[in-house]
Amino acid sequence: MRAVVVLLLVAVASAKVYDRCELARALKASGMDGYAGNSLPNWVCLSKWESSYNTQATNRNTDGSTDYGIFQINSRYWCDDGRTPGAKNVCGIRCSQLLTADLTVAIRCAKRVVLDPNGIGAWVAWRLHCQNQDLRSYVAGCGV
């Protein structure tokens, strides 16, 4: 029982809900501004609508896959959660690695996703809320 409590505390301690500007600065420092032709405001907008900037966000899909982390990266194609039938794991990671405050793995995988033919359009929330919009407000006042 004590081990379970310790594991839960570790999981909670590693979770993070980013502030908009804090995320913008972290993404910029990781080379996301302009990556594969996508401006920083696009990445911040995508993160807002996919996860509300929450690294612990998960969403189960009707096909049995799950979306994980701040970018809601899908277990059918990009990561291994050990329960999605026929998963491809193109990023070569465990989905649980996408649920931490450290964005390194999530950013590396998002950079891989955006190189596919759908580009940033692979994210439904980006298509619905960010595409062809004025996104300046997502980085306004952030000093980036």
UniProtKB/Swiss-Prot annotation:
Record note on pH: Optimum pH is 4.5-5.5. No activity above pH 8.8.
Temperature optimum or stability note: Optimum temperature is 33-49 degrees Celsius. Retains 25% of its maximal activity after heating 10 minutes at 80 degrees Celsius.
The name this protein goes by in its record: Lysozyme C II
Disulfide bonds: C21-C142, C45-C130, C79-C95, C91-C109
Top-rank taxon, per record: Eukaryota
One term of GO molecular function: lysozyme activity
GO process annotations (BP): defense response to Gram-negative bacterium; defense response to Gram-positive bacterium; killing of cells of another organism
The enzyme's E.C. designation: 3.2.1.17
Record localization: Secreted
GO cellular component, one term: extracellular space
Function text: Lysozymes have primarily a bacteriolytic function; those in tissues and body fluids are associated with the monocyte-macrophage system and enhance the activity of immunoagents. Has antibacterial activity against the Gram positive bacterium P.citreus. Has no antibacterial activity against the Gram negative bacteria E.coli and Y.ruckeri. Does not have hemolytic activity against trout erythrocytes.
N-terminal signal peptide: 1-15
Catalytic reactions on record: Hydrolysis of (1->4)-beta-linkages between N-acetylmuramic acid and N-acetyl-D-glucosamine residues in a peptidoglycan and between N-acetyl-D-glucosamine residues in chitodextrins
Keyword Membrane tagged: no
SUPFAM superfamilies associated with the record: Lysozyme-like (SSF53955)
Chief site of localization: secreted
UniProt KW Iron-sulfur keyword: no
Top enzyme category: hydrolase
Organism: Oncorhynchus mykiss
Family: Belongs to the glycosyl hydrolase 22 family.
Active site feature: E50, D67
